[in-house]
Curated annotation (Swiss-Prot):
Gene3D superfamilies: 3.40.1370.10. It holds the Pfam family Ribosomal_L4. It comes from Mesoplasma florum (strain ATCC 33453 / NBRC 100688 / NCTC 11704 / L1) (Acholeplasma florum). Keywords: Ribonucleoprotein, Ribosomal protein, RNA-binding, rRNA-binding. Belongs to the universal ribosomal protein uL4 family. GO terms for biological process: translation. Part of the 50S ribosomal subunit. Residues 44-85 are annotated as: Disordered. This is Large ribosomal subunit protein uL4.
Length: 208
């Protein structure tokens, strides 16, 4: 697969050849679905909790005597059917939301996501980001040159590049990640995927 490499002025500087086994595979919807569900489930904290009737304060005394009042018999004002009472079968914090996915399935989902972006021409390869200092204005100018301004964009660099991160952090809809943290959800959640040439080669080296 041949792709153009652009500079930050939006000009083509060369063409690179990418491995079809990574960037041009038939998308596998089930693998993508399973991987995204697993990734999102792993983010859940599982901290929600409700109190049972045993944990709610008060309610030890019988509200009224068993017989003779004409009312229905009651044993506690903290029974589940009372306002302010305990909750029956409520959520507890010991729930494990983890969903495991086979390594090969995750790899297939990753390659499928990259292939979708490439086939839709939403993958942009740049030679490098050459910032002398953090500059939001300069990053906006670069995005206009690459014709990706006003679009939800994921920028991938080989390493954590502080100047790129700081330059893009105040731009709405732009997220920056190092190649090692690239994931299926973020790829598909963005409209445009922008990668440095080094980052693209690093990703290909892992999944080819």
């Amino acid at each position: 697969m041949e792709l153009k490499v652009l500079n930050v002025q939006g000009q083509e500087v060369k063409t690179i050849s990418l491995n079809d086994s990574v960037w041009n595979v038939a998308p596998h919807k089930q693998a993508i679905y399973d991987t995204v569900i697993s990734q999102q489930a792993a983010l859940r904290q599982g901290t929600k909790k409700t109190k049972t009737r045993a944990e709610v304060r008060g309610g030890g005394k019988k509200p009224w005597r068993q017989k003779g009042t004409g009312r229905a018999r009651q044993g506690s004002i903290r029974a589940p059917h009372w306002r302010g009472g305990g909750v029956t079968f409520g959520p507890t914090p010991d729930i494990n939301y983890k969903k495991s996915v086979n390594k090969k399935v995750r790899a297939l989902a990753f390659k499928s996501a990259l292939s979708i972006k490439a086939s839709e021409q939403n993958l942009v390869i740049v030679d490098k980001f050459d910032f002398a200092k953090p500059s939001t204005k300069e990053m906006i100018s670069v995005m206009k040159n690459l014709q990706i301004d006003d679009q939800k964009t994921l920028i991938i660099t080989k390493e954590n590049e502080e100047l790129v991160i700081k330059s893009s952090s105040n731009i709405k809809g732009v997220k920056t990640l190092p190649s090692i943290k690239l994931n299926v959800f973020d790829i598909l959640n963005a409209t445009k995927l922008v990668m440095t040439e080094e980052a693209a080669m690093a990703v290909e080296g892992v999944y080819a």
